Amino acid sequence: MDISVLKQKENELRHLIDVTSVQNKKLANFAHIISHNLRSHSANFSMLLGFLKDETDEVEKQRILNMLSDASSNLLGTLDNLNKVVEINTHTNVAREHVNIKKYFLEAKNILTPKIKKNDIEININIPQNLSVYGIPSYFENIVLNLLTNAIKYRQPNKKLNININGKKEFGKIVFSIQDNGIGINLNRHGDKLFGMYKTFHNNSDARGIGLYITKSQIEAMGGNIIVSSEVNKGTTFKIYFDEGY
């Protein structure tokens, strides 16, 4: 066998071993997270059912029933998110294809048009038309949409939001970035937890602490890497790297 082909096969095997090792560590941590979250939901249901059993006032009973309905919706949401994480961490051989990066950013921008217009947001996309990665389309769609949604969600209330999206080939890598001038993140305080499951860093009622975890997991499942730079009240930049060969 040609030495270059043998070397390529060796690199592919090493990469597969590394990915599998990372996924196994995630699943071990995931078991603890499931246990913690389901116990929390169970305790909430038990408490509300206890209140309902002891309550005699009909108005108060209805209020508790509404709270039970909300608790049920929250549980379903949690199970849905956990299911997504399981799928990412256990399906490493999902069919891949060439994914046009600019196409997915344009589609995400179109989906978010109502929010963009309502909040007078400026989005600039500077990506070569033919720049692509070898990945999983559904993962890539979620990654792009989640990062743009985050930028919009965590904008500064009294400042026009500008989002700059760039993409290029660099030193054998496909690199694209999403830069905003939003409220930013204190990385000295939160950097080591930024991509953790159920970690939130802002007082936003919509924050669930799952989006960035799923985003990072999907990027890594496709052989990529994500890094972040940020400064409070200045903005945040996410950079995603994929090998050209993927």
Model-flagged regions — what are they?
Residues 117, 122-132:
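Conserved catalytic submotifs in the C-terminal HATPase_c
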Residues 185-198:
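Short conserved segment of the HATPase_c
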Residues 224-225:
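Conserved glycine-rich
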Residues 90-95, 132-135:
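Conserved micro-motifs of the catalytic ATP-binding
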